[in-house]
Every structure is written in structure tokens, then in C-alpha cells.
């Protein structure tokens, strides 16, 4: 990257933002208070070993919390008067201690080489639910290297007690975690059924795919490819297109292991994450077929006000679905995308800093999360997704966590310069897109 030009661009952006006085919607003070309260609750419930473990998959809960602390640290105003540096360090050390390795070949069976670094290993977390858990860990690892606690991709890991990571850099661990997903992607030659090609299921390499699980490698690699020096092989994205075309129902929604099974909101949000990751919007076969990105968004808009139900279904009050949908919409239409218009809150009920602010789907989500937060800073969650998992995802929605688009990113030093220039803009989160 041309650092001089990048710095100049960042300075220009800073000036432009400083001259724009309009807040992005409903009460920013309420959002900030909810985030602060949520982070304080998380800090108070962290175990002595650095983990959170409410779901039974400790690395997953811990990674979700780590991402919440990390993303807020990068926002204007950061952690405020609190200092969560020790919480971040302890969570990160737990995750690194918990890492396991698998062998990565130079040919995964279809002529493609997933062994990008040449190390011959891949990192993995979560046992039988490894795709989910590793997909939660990878974004957290990627984001801490942008400067939290002085970490960068070239920082050498030490003192974890895990010989597989100690002595390696964060960038190397991130790259070899990408290799786990690249190697474990379902191939044409090992697919349990033809439509499974290109996706993932619970454990990488099991020859199966499902519409819920497949979003997690995609979101993990979206974050990973934004880390300087980390590469995601093009063949992974190309193969994923096959799965995307197969699993989407003609009504725009997404099924579980077939396009007609268990179609719901959360899996549809996951498909949008995959469109952002691959750059592929899907294709329609003719009139009445909404099997593409626009169809998925229309499916979500029509069901936007649905409450959590039947374990996996619904939107509002369902942490898994809301985080899935948030990731999908933020990465495709941005926070202010007008494609979602079937709002939960009627105009008279909308809380705004400025009556002239235009309502959007993110404000709809944010007001709901502010209103449903418990006095202690937690949220009730739903079904499997309670405690730290629910709180962490809700915090990341409220602070408008930006899903990387995979383009070249500034070095941490340039990002720090931008953050300094925006230090007074506590109410500003992300430009409309």
C-alpha cells in the first residue's frame, strides 16, 4: 500500500466527517450507554481462566466477547473511562491455549492447494462443532491484530503454553486457520449429495453442507482477508458459488440441507454474508425465481418483524438470527440500505436525536436492543443463545461493527491516525452505504 496516499485519504475523510454534523439516527447516548453497560457486564462475568462458557463451547463464547471488546475499542470514544485491556489479553490467551491443529495437504483432492503458507497445519477449535466455533474465533483473531493492546499481524505469540502457537505470529495463525476452511470445504468428489458441493457443515471435510453452518467460514475469511499478508484462495470462493446457487429457495430464503428444508431468516442472512465474501450475487432462472441477493433481501424484508420462534426461526429477540442478518445486511446494503422498509417501530414510536433523521433497519435493531437490555447490562437471549453470546452479538450490532469487504486496508498506524482525528465524534459509527 502507498502509505502516504492512504494517510492523505484518511485525513480528507476525517475533515469531511468533522464537517458533517448530522447523527445517524436514534439516540446515540442510549446506544453508547447500552454498549458500556453490556461490556461492563461481560467483564464482570469473565472466568478466571479468561473464558466465557455459557454455550458449552467456551472458545465460541470467548471469541464473541473478544470481538465485542475489540470492535468497541476501535470506535470513537473507545471504552470510555474503563480499561478492558486485561480482559482482552486473558480472553485471547484462552483462545490460543485452546487451539488444536490438523494436517493440511498440498492437494485437497480436487487439485486445489489449501496449504497456503506451506506449514502443513491448520488451526481449529470446537470439536464436533468446529466449523461454527472456528468461524467465531477467526474474526476475533483478525481484529485484535489491528492494534488492540499493541498487537499486529507480525506480533509473535508467546506464553500461552500451547506449543502449536507459541513462537508463531498472529498473521501465521490466522493464515493457517484459513487453510482449515479451505481444506475442509465440501468438494465435488466427496460431497454426500451433489448439491452439497462448495459448502461446509459441522466439521470441515465431512462431505456435507448446511445453510446455517456455511456462513461461519465465510464470515471468518471475510475478516481474515482484511489482515495484511493473509490470503484466501480464489478457489474457495469459486466453489462456494455452487452451494449458494443450490441452497437458496426460489422465494429468496435459504434452506438447511436442501432449498426447501427449514427455510428461515437466519440462514438467509448467512447467504448474504456469502455474497459479500464471494462477490457473487447469485442468478435467477426466470420469472418468479428470487434466487439471488435481491431475493434474499426481499425475503428478509417481508419477514422483518417476526419474533423469535421455533428455536431457529424469527428475527427480533433471536440473537443468532439478528447477528446473522446484521452481518448479511451490513456487508451488502450498509446500515442505511433502503431495501429494508417493513420496520418494527411505527414512526410515532421511533426514538431519534433529530426528527429529520431517516429511519433504517439498523436503527430498528438498535432501538429494540436498547429497550430489551436488562438493568445489569445483559440480555435474556433466546434458546441456545443467551449470556455472553447474546450480549456480545448485541453489542456488535449496537456499535455498528463493520464487516470487511476484502479490499486493501490501511496499516494499523494509519487507522490509529484516523481514530485520533475522529476522537470527538462519539456519535458517529459508520458512513451510510
Where in this protein do the model-derived segments appear?
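Bacterial N-terminal signal peptides that target proteins for export
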Residues: 1-10
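Bacterial N-terminal signal peptides
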Residues: 10-19
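Sec/Tat signal peptide C-region and signal peptidase I cleavage site
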Residues: 21-25
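An alpha-helical repeat/solenoid feature that recognizes helix-turn-helix modules
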Residues: 26-37, 45-86, 100-238, 245-367, ...
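A short, hydrophobic C-terminal helix/tail in secreted or cell-surface proteins
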Residues: 410-428
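Short, charged juxtamembrane terminal tails flanking transmembrane helices
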Residues: 430-433
Amino acid at each position: 500500500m502507498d502509505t502516504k496516499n492512504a494517510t492523505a485519504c484518511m485525513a480528507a475523510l476525517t475533515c469531511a466527517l468533522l464537517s458533517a454534523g448530522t447523527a445517524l439516527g436514534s439516540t446515540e447516548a442510549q446506544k453508547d450507554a447500552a454498549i458500556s453497560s453490556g461490556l461492563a457486564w461481560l467483564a464482570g462475568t469473565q472466568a478466571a481462566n479468561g473464558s466465557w462458557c455459557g454455550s458449552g463451547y467456551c472458545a465460541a463464547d470467548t471469541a464473541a466477547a473478544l470481538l465485542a471488546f475489540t470492535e468497541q475499542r476501535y470506535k470513537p470514544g473507545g471504552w470510555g473511562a474503563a480499561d478492558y485491556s486485561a480482559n482482552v489479553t486473558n480472553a485471547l490467551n484462552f483462545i490460543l491455549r485452546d487451539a488444536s491443529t490438523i494436517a493440511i495437504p498440498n492437494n485437497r483432492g480436487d487439485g486445489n492447494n489449501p496449504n497456503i503458507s506451506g506449514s502443513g497445519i491448520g488451526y481449529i477449535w470446537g470439536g464436533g462443532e468446529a466449523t461454527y466455533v472456528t468461524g467465531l474465533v477467526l474474526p476475533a483473531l483478525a481484529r485484535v491484530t489491528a492494534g488492540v493492546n499493541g498487537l499486529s499481524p507480525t506480533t509473535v505469540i508467546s506464553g500461552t503454553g500451547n506449543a502449536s502457537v507459541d513462537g508463531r505470529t498472529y498473521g501465521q495463525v490466522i493464515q493457517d486457520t484459513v487453510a482449515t476452511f479451505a481444506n475442509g470445504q465440501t468438494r465435488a468428489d466427496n460431497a454426500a449429495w451433489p448439491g452439497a458441493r462448495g459448502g461446509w457443515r459441522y466439521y470441515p471435510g465431512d462431505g456435507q453442507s448446511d445453510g446455517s453452518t456455511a456462513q461461519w467460514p465465510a464470515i471468518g475469511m471475510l475478516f481474515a482477508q482484511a489482515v495484511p499478508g493473509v490470503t484466501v484462495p480464489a478457489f474457495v470462493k469459486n466453489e462456494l458459488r455452487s452451494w449458494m446457487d443450490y441452497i437458496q429457495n426460489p422465494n429468496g430464503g435459504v434452506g438447511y440441507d436442501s432449498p426447501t428444508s427449514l427455510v428461515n431468516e437466519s440462514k438467509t442472512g448467512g447467504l448474504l454474508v456469502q455474497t459479500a465474501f464471494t462477490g457473487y450475487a447469485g442468478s435467477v432462472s426466470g420469472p418468479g425465481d428470487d434466487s439471488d441477493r435481491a431475493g434474499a433481501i426481499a425475503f428478509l424484508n417481508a419477514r422483518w418483524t417476526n419474533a423469535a420462534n421455533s428455536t431457529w426461526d424469527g428475527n427480533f429477540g433471536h440473537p443468532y438470527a439478528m447477528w446473522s442478518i446484521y452481518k448479511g445486511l451490513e456487508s451488502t446494503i450498509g446500515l442505511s440500505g433502503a431495501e429494508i422498509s417493513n420496520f418494527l417501530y411505527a414512526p410515532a414510536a421511533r426514538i431519534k436525536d433529530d426528527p429529520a433523521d431517516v429511519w433504517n433497519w439498523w436503527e430498528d435493531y438498535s432501538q429494540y436492543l436498547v429497550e430489551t437490555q436488562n438493568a445489569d447490562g445483559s440480555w435474556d437471549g433466546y434458546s441456545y443463545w443467551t449470556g455472553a453470546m447474546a450480549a456480545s452479538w448485541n453489542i456488535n450490532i449496537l456499535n455498528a461493527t463493520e464487516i470487511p469487504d476484502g479490499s486493501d486496508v490501511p496499516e494499523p498506524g494509519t487507522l490509529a491516525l484516523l481514530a485520533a482525528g475522529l476522537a470527538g465524534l462519539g456519535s458517529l459509527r459508520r458512513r451510510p452505504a
